[in-house]
Amino acid sequence: MNQKQKDIIKRKTNEFCEEVKCLNLTEENKRVYNAFVYRRAKPYKFEIVDKYNNTIRFVLCTNKLDDGVLHILLKHYQGGVGKVSAYEILNFCDVIRKGEVNVNDNNMIYTYKQNGRIFKLIVALKRSNTGTNILKSFYSDRK
């Protein structure tokens, strides 16, 4: 990670904290918040039941540029294409709970329409029995 990316991540993390400081957070929201703010080395594990009664298990990586927290902060949080707010990020689990799913060999893509916006959450499927599903991205249809 270069210095410019580090500076952007620091600025966006501060903006994220400022945006959510007055919200009452659920336990789930707090876990997402902690992943985005504290970014410990160990990934955060999530287990969510979707509307089809499938239990979806995945990790949210906090230290990789190409997926998870850093990808969302750099590419989609208050950004250009696919813009999402801190509030929407805190509630990304609702996209799995309430959204439609499309599964291919590599990914589960959940799509959920709310307030005229379309949100997508992509979970990369594990490659082996010992592997782990990884949250790749979360974004909207905002341009």
Where are these predicted regions, by residue range?
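Ribonuclease/tRNase effector modules and their secretory precursors
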Residues: 1-143
